[in-house]
Amino acid sequence: MTAESRERFTEVVRSEPVDLAMACLLLGAEVAADLKPEPYLYRLDGLAQSASPQVAAASSAAEQAAALATTLGDRAGFGGSGADYLDLRSSLLHSVLDRRRGLPILLSVVWLEVAHRLGVPAYGVGLPGHFVVAIGTPTGESALVDPFAGGRLLPPTAAAEIVRSAGLDLTAEQLAPWSPVEILLRVLNNVRQLAATAEHFRTRLWAVELTLLLPRHPLQVRREHGELLVGLGDLVRGAAELTAYAEAVGPVDPVAADRALQEARLARARLN
């Protein structure tokens, strides 16, 4: 990603409302520097146009969900499989639109963006271990669908089973809408986890740096940033980031602050 792309990403994620599709496409510029978001936005427009006649004829949230599933799942072939969890492309919206394969959360972004273009109320739901979409409103009629399974309708029993597989019981809080920033944070966290090994440090680095550009992010990410910079040999910036993290976390976790300061001292010592 160029400095210009990162500046644009920052503007998008700090605007209201957040343009989720644009933010996800700008994220993809980290691996494809010449990526142009506009053709992919037009592709989302085209998917919405294809779904429009059936969606317009729907008279309930469940019928709207079924209409979207016909276009996005049956006709366009959007879905996923276990192998997609190990593929970085599954976390990049432009690749998901090209391949029509992806992680649940990126497939959900496709659904949300198509629904938005059609004026259909929809929101993302981050069930433990699996991301899905609700067609409808949080306080009114809604229907849960699983974009990873081609848009399969999820009755309450199926949603409860997904949550139960994570060792939990389904609660109302788990069905709450996710904001675009929360979705972006999860997307970037997925990239960070996929790139956890040393040979993928640079991929993990850009995921961390984009996370730090979000208006809200876990403080721990700043420490991770410092450690990555040190690991990649950027000792000055790494030590400075670890020190900044220590200053921020010190009032609530002095032990963590002391550890970070020790890491910063060791990094600076390597400069001599």
Predicted feature residues:
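A structural boundary/capping signal
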Residues: 1-272
